[in-house]
Amino acid sequence: MMGKLPLGVVSPYVKMSSGGCTDPLKFYATSYCTAYGREDFKPRVGSHRGTGYKSNYRPVVFYQPHLDALDNTATGEQGCNNFQTVTSQSYRPLEVPDGTHPLPWNLHQTNSGYSREKASAVTPIKEVRKVHFDTQDYGPQAITGLEPKDAPLLHQQQNKGSLEWENAGHGPRFMTSEYNSKYLKEPSHQPDLLQKNSVGAKEETGFTEESNKNPIVFQPPSQALPGDPVLLPGRSVTKSDFLPISHPHGDEFLPVLARGSERETGFSRVNERTLNPRVPPPCPEPSSMNHWQFQSPQRMQQTNVALLGRETVGNKEPSGFSLNNPSYVRSPYDPDMDNRYLTTYNQGYFENIPKGLDREGWTRGGLQPQKPGGYALNQPVTRLEATPTPTESLRRLHPHLGRTLISVDPFYRTAPPSGHVSRFTAPN
């Protein structure tokens, strides 16, 4: 059995209320709904007024001249051009000449026939001369009203070389720049003898003349061969190696084949040095007698050091690059399998990219475990709320609303415990 509900203090809005809500299913009845609510209330459907940008537009009334053609002709003629848009003025309909237009002044018309107005981007000289005067032709004192301008002291520019100081305060000369009118020196008409100018011999610049000798490349003149560019420290290697083209004059010697040279190619006159000169080159085919006499000697001439027995050939050793490399490291992923493409860079700088099973989730076709995304983390899991009990609902509601629900629905009570025989409780 449920005890009596507390009556509480009568609030002002309860006194103004027209009564409790008669709808038993309306559990969310508020004080505003009980005081001012109406049954079967439906909000009024409003009309779409458009956006704020469009609603702020003022209504535009388009004027047509034929509105005042009958009763007010003078007003129509005055306002016919006032309500014309720029587009209608600029883009007029096409007009075909009917023969009544005057003939052009020039026989050969140069301007286009598309537009009648002459579009000129450059101001003609005649219009410029009406505004700007040429002080070089007339002078500032020759024209009335062009006396030197007197500016206040605060408006005067005190810096050196001001433009307003030229031509009696009227600026630079007509159609000339500041540099041309101020800093360009006019050529003197005096002879060179009076100017005392003398032109000496052409010498090298200070960069090549005073250049220091290279301590690494430079050799004393006693150790350098004649004609060696090392003797000239001011001369670059490019000038010594890449000489200018010299055309033949006719007194040069004819090209002659040197002894022991090959006739297969004439591009290079110097034979390349073979790796093992002691072994004669293999001869797969027997050559003719004519070809044999132009071959190089079969036995290489020994030098004086080799004849004295002082020439020795050591064992073949690896280069310094292979000696300085660290020892070979097997692959940590598969110790039984050598890494064929293991380089020094891979040994020194470890690659932090997962391989093998660690990269299974990133390969194409691999099954990846499902991970919660940002949408699932930010959104709580939707759960159904438990069925509210009548006791908890009555405790949360206002006492006036609770009494109203009990008076309307007599079975709106808490279910008795399972030990009771009666399932429902009779109202008080």
Swiss-Prot record:
| GO MF term set | phosphatase binding
One cellular component (GO) term of this entry: sperm flagellum
Q: Looking at the record, which segments are called Disordered?
A: 201-231
Q: Which Pfam families match?
A: PPP1R32 (PF15691)
Q: Which GO terms describe its biological process?
A: flagellated sperm motility
Q: Indicate yes or no for the key word Cytoplasm.
A: yes
Record localization: Cell projection, Cilium; Cytoplasm; Cytoplasm, Cytoskeleton, Flagellum axoneme
Q: What is its main location?
A: other
The disulfides recorded in the entry are none
Subunit notes for this chain? Microtubule inner protein component of sperm flagellar doublet microtubules. Interacts with PPP1CA.
The name this protein goes by in its record: Stabilizer of axonemal microtubules 4
